[in-house]
């Protein structure tokens, strides 16, 4: 039922976009009669309008090429161009339409030399719709999935560095959501809840940029539930992995205090992440 509702919504958006696009641009763009290479004419005009951020006009040229010249060598790039025009509009509706275009490209042209670009733009469309850490993270999860697909399949492509950066940002956003929930549990003194949220998060993503706070909160939570031997490794990981952190000095003090009170600091528990 949800899938059908989503499909109906997408169909309605596509139909509305076609109507509005046609009205705004004066109708379909066609090459002048007698043009030697009409498909190239449409492609060049689409590129010119795309460069000038004339999204609707560019889309009409690309669309005419895609629909009228199925054997054109420019057809695949024009299909990408349609997606890029929707990306340029930067609205919730246009991102949905862009995602549809890039998914179709990957289905129609899975071995095309620009398939990597379609995958990158697909991931970016989700990335551009990510919400703040304590709001719905559906788009964040989709961005992670699609950027991970890019990193897995296209590690030798020039956009790999940017893809990895965006993947890291998306993972951090999702981790910040878990961290926020854990912080709430810590604040209301439900320390098992904080531990139960943070440990799986760090196991799943040990490279979380904000893990210094997670380490400190875990150490403090284990101390609160009278498990100092479990707390110590998290304070030590914080000190070892971060030269700068607002929790660094506090962690060092907790390490000194725990080592002074534990029967033997040597061989103390390795921590719940092991």
Q: Where do the language-model regions lie?
A:
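Acidic, polar-rich low-complexity tracts and alpha-helical solenoid repeat scaffolds
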Residues: 2-7, 20-274
């Amino acid at each position: 039922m949800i899938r059908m509702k989503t499909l109906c919504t997408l169909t309605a958006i596509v139909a509305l976009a076609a109507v509005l696009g046609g009205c705004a641009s004066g109708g379909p763009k066609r090459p002048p009669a007698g043009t030697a290479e009409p498909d190239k004419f449409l492609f060049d005009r689409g590129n010119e309008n795309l460069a000038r951020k004339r999204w609707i006009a560019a889309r009409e040229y690309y669309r005419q090429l895609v629909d009228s010249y199925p054997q054109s060598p420019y057809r695949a790039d024009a299909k990408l161009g349609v997606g890029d025009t929707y990306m340029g509009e930067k609205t919730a509706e246009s991102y949905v339409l862009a995602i549809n275009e890039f998914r179709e490209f990957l289905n129609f042209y899975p071995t095309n030399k620009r398939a990597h670009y379609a995958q990158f733009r697909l991931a970016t469309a989700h990335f551009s719709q990510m919400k703040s850490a304590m709001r719905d993270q559906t788009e964040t999860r989709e961005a992670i999935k699609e950027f991970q697909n890019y990193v897995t399949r296209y590690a030798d492509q020039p956009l790999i560095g940017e893809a990895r950066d965006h993947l890291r940002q998306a993972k951090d956003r999702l981790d910040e959501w878990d961290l926020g929930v854990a912080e709430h549990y810590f604040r209301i003194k439900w320390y098992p809840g904080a531990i139960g949220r943070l440990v799986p998060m760090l196991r799943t993503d040990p490279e979380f940029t904000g893990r210094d706070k997670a380490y400190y909160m875990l150490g403090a939570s284990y101390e609160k539930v009278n498990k100092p031997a479990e707390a110590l490794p998290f304070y030590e990981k914080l000190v070892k992995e971060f030269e700068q952190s607002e929790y660094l000095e506090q962690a060092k003090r907790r390490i000194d205090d725990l080592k002074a009170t534990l029967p033997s600091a040597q061989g103390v528990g390795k921590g719940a992440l092991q």
